[in-house]
């Protein structure tokens, strides 16, 4: 089921956006539109769906429009054309066409945000920060304390509940931000580069924690990042943006194997694709011989991760037979792996 959808959404900053929209329809670039009109094109004709329980990463360079599109989910960006639909308890809600009460309900109960700059209240305790949204929503104190305690336990900060947030490290403060977002019970989580200000080791640890939380909570997450490794590590799908336009959306595997254009190819050229590829991506098709009748050092299935194939070859050099229904349908040698890992670069150079 679709949790969020963008249908031909355009976002323009400035007065009289219709002049910019006309130039968008003519295929003009953001720079051309800005020079001619003085307006800033945030997003142009974006169409995208995010499914329930999915982590979709908006990826791009600074100024590509990813954070602007993210903010359209809860009505914080000036959408001037197109439709935004957010699945709420009462049905789909367009934050730009609903009444004020429906918009408040959307922001209070359906959508939560986690920011890069943690946006915590330094004069309040950890527990008070986690429960701040619940307090604003009018939740009774006893119920609020119970909910806050559950979220602090989830993010392993129970012992810090009564400390001021400025006593915590950066990574711990971001966990407070996560707990605050989780506490509302909102099914949709907007995360705007939440880990980019942290040290690499802490960032990796929080990525692992987010994936663990996701396995338990099954949120719908729209995640903004300019870190390619982060995007490919946590995203079920990735939408790559340039100058306000969505260039390609697909699984990490799809994007590595088939970049849509030179911009995407440049993005992924320095990525190690080994974590996205499987045996099927690099094998040499072979005849349907039985595994017993063909000389191979080991066998594996087509869906076996390539990293596991490498481990097998390290233990038993030779060729790995790829088996389907008891017959070998292909083989993989060390050279096949090298070719598979560099294929996306060769495509780019061509």
Which residues does each predicted region cover?
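Conserved ABC ATPase signature
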Residues: 164-168, 172-174
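ABC ATPase "signature
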Residues: 249-250, 258, 331
């Amino acid at each position: 089921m679709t949790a969020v959808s963008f249908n031909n959404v355009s976002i323009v900053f400035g007065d009289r956006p219709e002049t910019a929209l006309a130039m968008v329809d003519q295929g003009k670039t953001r720079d051309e539109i800005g020079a001619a009109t003085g307006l800033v094109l945030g997003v142009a004709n974006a169409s995208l769906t995010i499914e329930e329980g999915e982590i979709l990463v908006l990826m791009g360079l600074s100024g590509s429009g990813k954070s602007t599109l993210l903010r359209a989910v809860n009505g914080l960006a000036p959408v001037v054309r197109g439709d935004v639909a957010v699945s709420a308890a009462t049905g789909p809600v367009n934050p730009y066409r609903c009444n004020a009460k429906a918009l408040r309900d959307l922001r209070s109960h359906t959508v939560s945000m986690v920011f890069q700059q943690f946006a915590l209240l330094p004069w309040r305790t950890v527990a008070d920060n986690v429960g701040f949204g619940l307090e604003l929503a009018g939740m009774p104190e006893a119920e609020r304390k119970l909910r806050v305690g559950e979220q602090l336990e989830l993010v392993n900060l129970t012992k810090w509940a009564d400390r001021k947030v400025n006593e915590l490290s950066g990574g711990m403060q971001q966990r407070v931000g996560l707990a605050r977002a989780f506490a509302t019970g909102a099914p949709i989580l907007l995360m705007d580069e939440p880990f980019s200000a942290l040290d690499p080791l802490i960032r990796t640890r929080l990525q692992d924690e987010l994936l663990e939380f996701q396995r338990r909570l099954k949120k719908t997450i729209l995640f903004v990042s300019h870190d390619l490794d982060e995007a490919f590590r946590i995203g079920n799908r990735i939408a790559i943006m340039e100058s306000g336009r969505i260039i390609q959306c697909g699984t990490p595997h799809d994007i590595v194997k088939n970049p849509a254009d030179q911009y995407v190819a440049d993005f992924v050229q320095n990525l190690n694709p080994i974590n996205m590829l499987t045996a099927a991506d690099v094998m040499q098709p072979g005849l349907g011989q039985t595994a017993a009748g063909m000389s191979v050092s080991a066998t594996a299935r087509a869906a076996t991760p390539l990293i596991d194939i490498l481990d097998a070859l390290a233990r038993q050099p030779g060729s790995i037979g790829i088996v389907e229904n008891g017959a070998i349908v292909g083989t993989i040698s060390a050279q096949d792996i090298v070719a598979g890992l560099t294929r996306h670069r060769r495509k780019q150079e061509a």
